[in-house]
């Protein structure tokens, strides 16, 4: 168990705003204290209204993203309507739980906007599913969560949430050797999503 937790490298944050959701993560890919890449992508759009962000082993993050993206696309074709954020998160929860004996080494959050408004869900490697207003995952989470908690309010806008997410990740990067090398953000609103990348 402790070996697995040590592999939850990096820092990922999610913030639910009144008009959407912001997901963000730094770009460093490391195994222990070995720096493998400075350009890892850990934040992905799944549909035009749902996104995913994760900390952990990059191969597992990429696999989770591909599988959930394909399953949601199939569901939307079969149902002939968009999948809700909650349904997407539950689908991922089932997928993770089915692999509980050989779990993906990744902590994940799913966020987006649907008819019920903005939603943010947090999942561990075994598929536990928690809905929250904000979250931080990975080695830098302890540093990032304090900043987010201090700056968060229920009336926060996506613009303010993006600034808060970037500030929290920058602070985590300053204190966590497994985090660094830039920040990717994904802002999801009723108009779709917008990706951005910040070099540090």
Swiss-Prot record:
EC number(s) on record? 3.4.25.1
Under the heading Pfam families, the entry gives:
Proteasome
Q: PROSITE patterns, from UniProt?
A: PROTEASOME_BETA_1, PROTEASOME_BETA_2
GO cellular component terms, alphabetically, are:
cytoplasm; proteasome core complex, beta-subunit complex
The superkingdom listed in its UniProt entry is Archaea
Which residues catalyse the reaction?
11 (nucleophile)
Propeptide residues per the UniProt entry: 1-10
- Description of how activity is regulated: The formation of the proteasomal ATPase PAN-20S proteasome complex, via the docking of the C-termini of PAN into the intersubunit pockets in the alpha-rings, triggers opening of the gate for substrate entry. Interconversion between the open-gate and close-gate conformations leads to a dynamic regulation of the 20S proteasome proteolysis activity.
Q: Which GO terms describe its biological process?
A: proteasomal protein catabolic process
Alphabetical keyword list: Autocatalytic cleavage, Cytoplasm, Hydrolase, Protease, Proteasome, Threonine protease, Zymogen
**An annotated Gene Ontology molecular function:** threonine-type endopeptidase activity
Enumerate the catalysed reactions. Cleavage of peptide bonds with very broad specificity
**UniProt-annotated location(s):** Cytoplasm
Q: How does it assemble?
A: The 20S proteasome core is composed of 14 alpha and 14 beta subunits that assemble into four stacked heptameric rings, resulting in a barrel-shaped structure. The two inner rings, each composed of seven catalytic beta subunits, are sandwiched by two outer rings, each composed of seven alpha subunits. The catalytic chamber with the active sites is on the inside of the barrel. Has a gated structure, the ends of the cylinder being occluded by the N-termini of the alpha-subunits. Is capped at one or both ends by the proteasome regulatory ATPase, PAN.
What family, per the record?
Answer: Belongs to the peptidase T1B family.
Summarizing the function annotation, the protein's role is: Component of the proteasome core, a large protease complex with broad specificity involved in protein degradation.
Its recorded name reads Proteasome subunit beta 2
User: To which species is this protein native?
Assistant: Caldivirga maquilingensis (strain ATCC 700844 / DSM 13496 / JCM 10307 / IC-167)
């Amino acid at each position: 168990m402790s070996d697995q937790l040590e592999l939850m490298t990096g820092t990922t944050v999610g913030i639910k705003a009144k008009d959407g959701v912001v997901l963000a993560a730094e770009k460093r890919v490391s195994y222990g204290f070995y720096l493998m890449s400075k350009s890892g992508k850990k934040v992905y759009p799944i549909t035009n209204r749902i996104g995913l962000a994760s900390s952990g082993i990059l191969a597992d993050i990429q696999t989770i993203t591909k599988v959930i993206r394909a399953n949601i696309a199939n569901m939307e074709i079969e149902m002939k309507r968009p999948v809700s954020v909650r349904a997407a998160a539950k689908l991922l929860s089932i997928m993770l739980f089915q692999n509980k004996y050989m779990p993906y080494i990744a902590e994940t959050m799913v966020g987006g906007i649907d008819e019920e408004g903005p939603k943010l869900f947090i999942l561990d490697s075994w598929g536990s599913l928690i809905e929250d207003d904000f979250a931080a995952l990975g080695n830098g989470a302890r540093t990032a969560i304090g900043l987010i908690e201090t700056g968060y309010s229920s009336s926060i806008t996506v613009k303010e949430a993006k600034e808060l997410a970037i500030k929290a990740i920058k602070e985590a990067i300053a204190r966590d050797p497994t985090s660094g090398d830039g920040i990717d953000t994904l802002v999801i609103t009723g108009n779709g999503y917008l990706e951005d990348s910040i070099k540090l």
